[in-house]
Amino acid sequence: MDLVVSGSHGKGGLLTLVAPGHPHLAFIRKLMDLRRKSVHRALCSIMKEAEEKNIKITHILTDNGTEFTDTLKIQKITRAMLFYTHAYASWEKGSIENFNRIIRRFYPKRTDFSKLTSKAVENLQEKLVNYPRPTQLKQKVAA
């Protein structure tokens, strides 16, 4: 779980959650601001969607950002174990960082995410879930 933050003049951001070990089980939610309450609301929405799709998220890996520090609340919302990476160790959550890098291909650094519609965020999630990954390309070539 991580945030992709709007540019310096923008507001809000995107909350991203990738199911560990499954880069194609990913969720994106738009946040109007970066406060804990907004993150909790977005997490509720993600968990509802995961439940509808019959996806079980058993554990979540995130960084030590202030928006993720309410461990008990997040565990209550997600019903999953929450693990934190070490400070400045983004490689410890490589799949989410790679997912965020792909988002930046569509929406560069200066993007104001508060101006995105919820439909645009849904479309982005669908695109990225089906986005070809290098491991998939190797498998297709070998077949």
Regions found by a protein language model. Give the residues of each.
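Mobile-element integrase/transposase regions
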Residues: 1-15, 109
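Mobile genetic element proteins and their domesticated derivatives, centered on retroelements
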Residues: 2, 17, 24, 43, ...
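Active-site beta-loop-alpha junctions of metal-dependent nucleic acid enzymes
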Residues: 6-10, 18, 28-53
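A glycine-rich, aromatic-flanked flexible loop/lid motif
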Residues: 10-22, 72-75, 96
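Short, surface-exposed connector motifs at secondary-structure boundaries
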Residues: 23-25, 52-58, 106-107
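Short small-residue beta-strand/loop micro-motif enriched in glycine and branched aliphatics
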Residues: 23-29, 84, 109
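Acidic/histidine-rich, metal-coordinating catalytic segments
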Residues: 55-70, 88
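Charged alpha-helix within mobile-element recombinases
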Residues: 72-143
